[in-house]
């Protein structure tokens, strides 16, 4: 397992955010605004095999790294194998800065750009949140104004997932909220 500088070894058993302070995050976002990924990106690192070792061969682990602020369209042109390789290198270099020796532990890397995510699973512009997490698209405005109560545009149609409140990154909550609305409607005799 990687050893993150300044953190106890047990930190690898949870989520480790690499993002520093607000200035670090703002610089990462600025790169995104101008059509590039950040050379020092904001990262969410999770090693699920610390909780469920059956997900990898004995003695091995895998790490999932969510990179914030990666543009769908690059200012320099479309994503290519070369740009993807440089992006991957920048992410690995950033982790290495915070967990010295990390790159020596890596046996395989699989990188997904926003373009890959859109083409593989159909999420528009690779946005795993199914919409921006901005004030005009949060709370009762999620997924859009008038559809914020988990009910769809016709009877017996309910919505859940990242595109509904509270949005992406809150696992299970949108589904639980939609189920509560469905149960309320069922008790009132609305659901058939």
Model-derived features with residue positions:
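C-terminal structured subdomain/cap of oxidoreductase catalytic cores
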Residues: 1-6, 60, 83-91, 128-192
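Flavin-binding catalytic cores
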Residues: 19-22, 30-39, 58, 81-122
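Solvent-exposed residues in well-ordered beta-strands and their adjoining turns
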Residues: 1-2, 68-70
